[in-house]
Each structure stands twice: as structure tokens, then as C-alpha cells.
Amino acid sequence: MAGNKSSDFSHLPLATNKAMECALTGSELLSCTYLNKGSAFTEEERDEFELVGLLPSNVQTLDEQVKRAYAQFSTRPDNLAKNTFMTSLKEQNEVLYYRLIQDHLKEMFPIIYTPTEGEAISKYSSLFRRPEGCFLNVNEPEKVEQSMSQWGGPDDIDLIVVSDGEQILGIGDQGVGGILISIAKLAIYTLCAGIHPHRTLPVVLDTGTNNEDFLKDDIYLGLRQERVRGEKYDKLVDTFVKTARKQYPNAYIHFEDFGLPNARRILDEYTPKIACFNDDVQGTGCVTLA
């Protein structure tokens, strides 16, 4: 149903059979990855939301869309191409993206996460099409608050996954490509824990890279400088944590794929102060002991 509310989806349930108010119409609605239903918009919705002429005539169910999307997925020649297809699908229609994975979780988990996501991360700059997530620059700590303020108010974010990209999935320093591990981990939270994707925030701390290939690569999208250590690094981490606590006080912070010395040190520093978790230290430890 049409309405006058802004497109703030933070408090929507993960799934609903009820009508939702939406102020978007026409091409703007089709460009909204969360609300776009593609060929599943009914005749009534096409009239109400000014979509007539913007979609093929046949109205399809979500099940029919899933069938087509799975066929498209299956024709991709290799796992990286399948990963890229899934990323593209997510950028167009999130409901279809999550439903497709849910129906084929065992097959697609290795595509959207390890091991295939590692290859996608290593090629982040060459495969880049559009940004997703929050990018924090170690040389601009004064802009952290502005950067993190764009995802809603104090009650809008439940979970933040943050990485500095130094030790990604066993493949080492991936620099700014670390944003993809934050995104992938949050997709797993949605699929396996039911956390609404629009109540999460993926973050990368761009502190440079010691990956020589990236430092020499003109198309690398992150800071082309050696990794920052010491006080300047700690200032960015601390500014991020304090800003997250200020802007999203109910959010749980998940530290992901930091280099081991920093991972342990950061966890020890902030565990007494905030709700936080490091998967590589605590998650791996728990699984090993189990």
C-alpha cells in the first residue's frame, strides 16, 4: 500500500504477509533492493505504484522467481561466477536472494561464504560494481561519526560486523576487500539466526595494506599505503567503537578477521566495556574445545 512514510525499513519483521507502507513508486521502487519484487508485483500493485509499462506483463509468484533464479545460478560456469551472480541478485531483490539461498542452503553456503567468498574478496577491486557497507579511513578519524550516521537512529542497528581486512579467511591481507567478509558474515546471521538485514551494518577499517600486489595496482580501491600500526591505528579502532556505542547503543559488535595480535588485544581492551565478540578468537576456540 502507498503511504507517506520514508523508506526506513529498520523495524520491519524479517518476513510478513501484511501490506507495508511505502512512499516509493516507479523506477525508484524497482531500484530499492529491499522492496523490489520484480515480476512478482501484482496487477493492483503495478497500478498503485506506477509500475505499468516498467515490467514484463506476466505476474509471477516468489516460487516461480526462485525457480528461474536457480536455473540462472546453475548455468554459471564456475563458483566465482556463481558468487558474482548472487551478489548481483542481492543488489536487485533481497527477498529473492535470501529465499533462493534458504531453499538451497547446503549448495550455496560455500558460494556466498568460504571458500568462494575468499576468492571474491581477493578480487574485490576488479569485480567492484557498487558499494555496500561503511568504509572508515584511518587518515580521517574525524569523519567516522559522519560516516556511521547514515544507517538510522539509536534503535535501528542490532549487529555490526567490522574487519580491518588483515587476515581474511586464511588468505592474508586483503585490505579494503575486507568489507566483503563483513557483508558475508551478516548474510549468514540473517539466514541462520533470523536477524533482519536492515538492522545490521557491515564495516571495514581501511588502515592500508601490506599486500604488495594491491600497493602496485592502479585499480585497488583502498588506501595504497602500508598498514598503519600503533597509536594511529588504535585511534581509529577506538573512535569506531565509541561512535558505534553512541549512535547505536544496542548494537552488538562482531570483530572479524583482524590480524591475530590486534584481534586478541582489541578483544581484551573492549570486552569489559561493550558487548562484543571475535569469531576468530572465541568462535574458533569454542569449536575446537567442543
Where are the language model's segments positioned?
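Metallocofactor- and cofactor-centric catalytic cores in central/energy metabolism, strongly enriched
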Residues: 2-290
